[in-house]
Every structure is written in structure tokens, then in C-alpha cells.
Amino acid sequence: MASNNSIHQFSIPGLTGGMVDFGAFQGKKILVANTASECGLTPQYKQLQELQEEYKDSLVVVGIPCNDFGGQEPGTADTIAAFCGRNYGVTFPLTEKLSTKAPNQAPIFQFLTSKELNGLQDDEIKWNFHKFLLDEEGHLIASFPSTANPIEAMLQYMPA
């Protein structure tokens, strides 16, 4: 049973069906990013996919599309999935499109940005591709701004 300050309590519909059950990722680190297909930072999909491939036994990358910043994720689920697969070879889980901001902020983003809920820190998502790192028990251990290179940001947290 996941504790209240663990991301393992969340299960979100997948972009193209099924569920992304964070509880199924127990024992692995989880890197969550709010993503967008029409953003200047969209090429980070490539780096996120490289992390997923390099550390597949100890890390799960999860992309959560959002249209909160500049309307840069206007597509349908099928359009987003096709774009990510065709352009970046994305194989990591993508959830349905969610909101990162109030008043419609999704519960998972409430958890990731509230110290009261995650036990570590309050945080504000200011743009697409903000990244959150959670440990093997689902506890938040780090947050990286949108401009942080995912691979460089993760170096200190992953085995050499």
C-alpha cells in the first residue's frame, strides 16, 4: 500500500488507452515531465527517451501532456502519440492530457507541487518540461526546471 506522500497512490488514464499505474513502478525511480509537442523544449523528448533506454531497469520516465503554457499541446491523444513515436521514438508511458495549474490542476500535480502532500517542497510549474524525480518508494527527491537538460540533471541520481 502506497503512503500518502508517495506517487504510487496515483493511476492515470494512458494517452492511448489503459492506465498508467504509478504503483506498478515501485522499486524504480520515476521521472515525471509535463510535456508539449509544439514547444521550443519539445526536443527534450529525445533526452527523456534516452534516459528511459539507458536506465530501463532502474528508472521509468512518464510524460504528462499539458496545454497550459502557450497552448503548445493542442493535439488529440492520437495526434500526440503519433508525434512522439514518429519524431522521438518515445516508448515510455504517456498519460492523458492533464492540467498543471489551478483551478483545474490534476491531483498528481497538486501532489508534486505541494510540500504538505509530497513531504519535500512546494514547487511551481512555470513552463512545459518541468521535471520531478521520485525515488524507488515514490517519494519526491528532486525537481528540475523546464530548461534543465534531463540527462545532465539526472547524472547525480543514477548509477554510472
Sequence positions of predicted segments:
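Conserved helix-turn-beta segment immediately C-terminal to the redox Cys motif
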Residues: K28-K29, E38, T42-N67, C84-Y88
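Thiol-based oxidoreductase modules, predominantly thioredoxin-like and allied folds used
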Residues: N34, S58-T76, T91-A102
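Short, internal strand/loop/helix patches
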Residues: D78-K126
